[in-house]
UniProtKB/Swiss-Prot annotation:
<protein>
    <recommendedName>
        <fullName>Acetyltransferase Atu2258</fullName>
        <ecNumber>2.3.1.-</ecNumber>
    </recommendedName>
</protein>
<dbReference type="InterPro" id="IPR000182">
    <property type="entry name" value="GNAT_dom"/>
</dbReference>
<comment type="function">
    <text>Catalyzes the transfer of an acetyl group from acetyl coenzyme A (AcCoA) to an acceptor substrate and releases both CoA and the acetylated product. It prefers glucosamine 6-phosphate or dopamine. It can also use the thialysine, N(8)-acetylspermidine, chloramphenicol, puromycin, polymyxin B, and 4-aminobutyrate ethyl ester.</text>
</comment>
<dbReference type="GO" id="GO:0016747">
    <property type="term" value="F:acyltransferase activity, transferring groups other than amino-acyl groups"/>
</dbReference>
<feature type="domain" description="N-acetyltransferase">
    <location>
        <begin position="1"/>
        <end position="137"/>
    </location>
</feature>
<feature type="binding site">
    <location>
        <begin position="66"/>
        <end position="68"/>
    </location>
    <ligand>
        <name>CoA</name>
    </ligand>
</feature>
<feature type="binding site">
    <location>
        <begin position="108"/>
        <end position="110"/>
    </location>
    <ligand>
        <name>CoA</name>
    </ligand>
</feature>
<dbReference type="Pfam" id="PF00583">
    <property type="entry name" value="Acetyltransf_1"/>
</dbReference>
<dbReference type="InterPro" id="IPR016181">
    <property type="entry name" value="Acyl_CoA_acyltransferase"/>
</dbReference>
<keyword id="KW-0808">Transferase</keyword>
<dbReference type="InterPro" id="IPR050680">
    <property type="entry name" value="YpeA/RimI_acetyltransf"/>
</dbReference>
<keyword id="KW-0012">Acyltransferase</keyword>
<feature type="binding site">
    <location>
        <position position="74"/>
    </location>
    <ligand>
        <name>CoA</name>
    </ligand>
</feature>
Length: 137
């Protein structure tokens, strides 16, 4: 047995690790009901300028990315995106949502929207911390 440390991505090795892990998780937890959930902010020319990227799975909404263009900030767009995602997640039978952030401004926005801190890690090398939050519906 050899252990090989590398700083180069190896798609073949990743697949060899991922596939049996996915099979194990399927056997242990059953099929996932994961569904993507994306909300885009588009310009008049239909180009995407921001939005929300996430998914629902196993009764929870995960908000992976949320971006509002700087010129649109402070206009209630982030809460609108979160509300739209929450509404769809409820329709899908979710009991809550979770999100993580390193941005102190985003953290305040999420807390104002009803998310509560459930954990943090830090300081990171940048001096910031990463915070995980949840909101139960």
């Amino acid at each position: 047995m050899n252990f090989v440390l590398s700083d180069v991505a190896d798609a073949e090795a990743e697949k060899a690790i991922r596939d049996p892990l996915v099979a194990y998780n399927l056997a242990r937890f059953g099929e996932s009901d994961k569904r993507d959930l994306n909300i885009t902010i588009r310009n008049d020319d239909n180009s995407v300028t921001g939005g929300l990227v996430g998914h629902t799975a196993r009764g929870w909404l995960y908000v992976q990315l949320l971006f509002v263009p700087e010129a649109m900030r402070g206009q209630g767009i982030a809460p609108k995106l979160l509300a739209m995602a929450e509404e769809e997640a409820r329709k899908r039978g979710c009991m809550g949502a979770y999100i993580d952030t390193m941005n102190p401004d985003a953290l305040r926005t999420y807390e104002r929207y009803g998310f509560t801190k459930i954990g943090s890690l830090g300081p990171l090398s940048s001096g910031q911390s990463i915070t995980w939050l949840e909101k139960r519906f």
